[in-house]
Structure formats: structure tokens, C-alpha cells
């Protein structure tokens, strides 16, 4: 399973991802598929500490509800494209705890596989507010909740006090209060 993103009013173009931040753009009308990964690296058997970016096995991909030509993708940082993935801009610093001692090969010391997708200190969920363009919420697999209210220029750690390390796997912006979000930590 992985994230999929598309324009609900015109679902012909679909973005889908896999491990290591691989992301494809698929055109349902033509059947064509094209890799649009931000940084062309396939780091099988490369320790995450030696990679440019760290991606969760299921790295978030979303389209903006305000401009469907804008897509976001996340690793340990957030990327933005306004041209359907032809070019990308990094719009955040590392939003994780960036614990280098946990960036061993194959996900070590937590998992011991060599597929290259077992990274830690990654963004596991990303959403843009439907109330206001440029308000993005990001959750990580190390329990951090971050928000930007200016399209990524500035990010604030808004992790509630007392929350321990955990995987943030869902963020829903309140439909009634644009400054609040509901978060699931597991």
C-alpha cells in the first residue's frame, strides 16, 4: 500500500509512490507512466545516514486542494512541485528528530532488512488545510507534529506536551477551527 494523489475533479493524472521516495505520474488516458522523483537515487543497501533524503516506505504524496497542479511529497523534508512533478523545491528543513544513530543500514537498529525502505526519522503524514492555502501539517515516525502557515518558509513544532515517540499516521484539519488538527499517534 502507498499514498496516491490526484485531482478529484479530473482523476486522469494519478501520482503514486513506493519505497525510497520513488514517485510516478500516471496518465490514465494514455496509459503512460513517468518517474518524477525529486532526487534520482536508488539507495538499495545504502545506509540512510549516507543518503541525501530519508523516505518512509509509504512516503506522503498529496495534491493541493487549492491548486491541483501543485503536489507535495515528503521524506525527512517536504518537497513542492507546481508543474506536476517536472521540478521540485524543498520547502522545509528536516522536520524529524534526525537521530543519526538510528540511521543504520536496512533500518537498523529497528528492522533488519535490505530493501532500502526501512528508514527512521521520516515524515509519515502530510496534509494541507482546506481552509487556507500554504498551511501544511506534517507528522513523523518519531512523534513530531509540525505546521507551516506560510507555504513552508517557517515551520513550528506543535507536538503536544507529553506525547512520546510514536508514528503519526493521520492528521485531519478541523472543519470548524482552521487552527486545530486531529492527530493519530500509534
Functional labels for PLM-detected ranges:
Residues 1-186:
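Beta-propeller blade termini and top-face loops
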Amino acid at each position: 500500500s502507498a499514498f496516491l494523489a490526484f485531482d478529484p475533479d479530473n482523476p486522469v493524472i494519478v501520482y503514486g509512490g513506493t519505497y525510497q521516495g520513488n514517485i510516478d505520474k500516471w496518465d490514465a488516458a494514455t496509459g503512460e507512466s513517468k518517474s518524477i522523483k525529486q532526487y534520482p537515487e536508488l539507495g538499495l543497501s545504502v545506509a540512510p545516514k549516507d543518503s541525501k533524503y530519508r523516505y518512509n516506505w509509504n512516503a506522503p504524496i498529496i495534491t493541493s486542494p487549492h491548486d491541483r497542479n501543485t503536489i507535495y511529497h515528503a521524506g525527512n523534508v517536504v518537497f513542492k512541485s507546481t508543474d506536476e512533478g517536472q521540478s521540485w523545491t524543498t520547502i522545509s528543513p528536516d522536520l524529524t528528530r534526525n537521530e543519526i544513530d538510528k540511521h543504520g543500514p536496512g533500518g537498523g537498529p529497528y528492522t533488519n532488512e535490505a530493501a532500502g525502505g526501512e528508514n527512521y526519522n521520516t515524515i509519515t503524514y502530510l496534509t494541507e488545510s482546506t481552509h487556507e492555502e500554504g498551511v501544511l501539517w506534517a507528522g513523523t515516525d518519531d512523534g513530531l507534529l509540525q505546521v507551516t502557515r506560510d507555504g513552508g518558509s517557517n515551520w513550528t513544532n506543535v507536538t503536544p506536551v507529553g506525547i512520546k515517540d510514536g508514528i503519526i499516521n493521520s492528521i485531519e484539519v478541523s472543519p470548524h477551527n482552521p487552527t486545530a488538527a486531529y492527530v493519530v499517534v500509534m
